[in-house]
Amino acid sequence: MDERLWEWDFEVAEAIACEERRQSRTIELIASENFTSPAVLAAVGSVLTNKYAEGYPGRRYYGGCECVDRVEELAIQRAKQLFGAPHVNVQPHSGAQANMAAYFAVLQPGDRILGMSLQHGGHLTHGAKVNLSGRWFEVAFYGVDPETERIDYDAVWHIAREIRPKLIISGASAYPRVIDFARLREIADDVGAILMADIAHIAGLVAVGLHPSPIGVAQLVTTTTHKTLRGSRGGMIMCDAEFAEAVDKAVFPGTQGGPLMHVIAGKAVALGEALRPTFRTYIERVLENARVLAETLQAEGFRLVSGGTDNHLLLVDLRSHGLSGRKAERVLDEVGITVNKNTIPNDPKPPTQASGIRLGTPAMTTRGFGPDEMRLTARWIADVLRAPDDESVKARVRAEVAELVSRFPVPGVTIEARTGVDDGTV
């Protein structure tokens, strides 16, 4: 944080400092979160936030865009190089905005879509009733096999043949296994549907070849630019050349006005970082840490949905321990371990309570955690969840967590912020 903010707006500075301390003093296991580099933070905090740039490079509705054109072109070219995509739009403000624009590019209100059920690991924007996607379109859902808890591709095929959707959506927010995009494209082709892949969670894995890529398989690919990509918070659409014009028009002027050029600069920086060999090493460590976390929790007696993980996240089923996800989230937060409650397939509890928690390794891998730290973390989670009301257990774990994280700084956070005076807010 710019120290001058303390003079300009003490209340906001205090809130930001509080968050700096919280991030520094906790083990961050929310699967959708990560820590950006100081370079990304610098780009997002730059003077580019002052510039309006409606339109696209070379075709703006405002003057003075020659510099921001360079930034957007860099982001586009780096994304194309990283993913091998024919066309890229880097303007969506978020993953949800990217999905809405992708729908807007190829669908009309009332068209039929087929997406993964939110209760089985899908995402709100894949047709959930509470989302615009569930109000604009006629929606059907597929899910996981009740025994294996993996996507049942034969069932997807049968549903698709029955309802004949115009669009099939692949991708998930809480699915710990590899997604077979090629099989889904076969299903889409069989029923005359377009295939869209939402790779928001696995984009970093896809970028380095550690998860099968949907590029060249799905006609439309959407993603966020944070999560496993470690960039600024935003969205991106990649597509076949035949959909390029429709996608660009769907983003602007279809669903957005001016792009956030400072955020696009952050995307460009992160995409450049992802092109370096060190990024593949990082993703390899993310996957190794997830496997170790999963194996240790299983050894401690916890059941994992689908029996493990192939990617950066895992789902822990808490039913046999008599805990709701909500309580597990709360008691772990009390000891400095941040997770989120999450429904599991066929969950008997409502989403506000949930029967599981979702864990992910991208953030702490960025801070330098390796297998040894993940084993410790898993054992602490087990200790707390086996005795959620035992204050002595929580006090011990809280102290051990604090000592461990003090050795693994958050990128871009100063020593003073990490060890500053405790005001009781964290």
Swiss-Prot record:
Q: Disordered: where is this region? A: 342-368
Q: Does the keyword Transferase apply?
A: yes
Residues binding (6S)-5,6,7,8-tetrahydrofolate, per UniProt: L118, G122, H123, L124
Stated family:
Belongs to the SHMT family.
> What reaction does this enzyme carry out catalytically?
(6R)-5,10-methylene-5,6,7,8-tetrahydrofolate + glycine + H2O = (6S)-5,6,7,8-tetrahydrofolate + L-serine
- The gene it comes from is glyA
- Give the subcellular location: Cytoplasm
Q: What does the record give as cofactor? A: pyridoxal 5'-phosphate
Function summary: Catalyzes the reversible interconversion of serine and glycine with tetrahydrofolate (THF) serving as the one-carbon carrier. This reaction serves as the major source of one-carbon groups required for the biosynthesis of purines, thymidylate, methionine, and other important biomolecules. Also exhibits THF-independent aldolase activity toward beta-hydroxyamino acids, producing glycine and aldehydes, via a retro-aldol mechanism.
UniProt-listed GO biological process terms: glycine biosynthetic process from serine; tetrahydrofolate interconversion
Alphabetical keyword list? Amino-acid biosynthesis, Cytoplasm, One-carbon metabolism, Pyridoxal phosphate, Transferase
InterPro entries from the UniProt entry = PyrdxlP-dep_Trfase (IPR015424), PyrdxlP-dep_Trfase_major (IPR015421), PyrdxlP-dep_Trfase_small (IPR015422), Ser_HO-MeTrfase (IPR001085), Ser_HO-MeTrfase-like (IPR049943), SHMT-like_dom (IPR039429)
One family from Pfam that matches here is SHMT
Name the site position(s) for Plays an important role in substrate specificity.
Answer: H226
Its UniProt pathway annotation is: One-carbon metabolism; tetrahydrofolate interconversion; Amino-acid biosynthesis; glycine biosynthesis; glycine from L-serine: step 1/1
Q: Which CDD domains match?
A: SHMT
User: Where, per the database record, does this protein carry N6-(pyridoxal phosphate)lysine?
Assistant: K227
Upper lineage:
Bacteria, Pseudomonadati, Thermomicrobiota, Thermomicrobia, Thermomicrobiales
UniProt entry tagged with the keyword Oxidoreductase: no
GO MF terms held by the record:
glycine hydroxymethyltransferase activity; pyridoxal phosphate binding
Q: What is its EC number?
A: 2.1.2.1
Q: Which GO terms describe its cellular component?
A: cytosol
Question: How does this chain assemble?
Answer: Homodimer.
Protein name as catalogued: Serine hydroxymethyltransferase
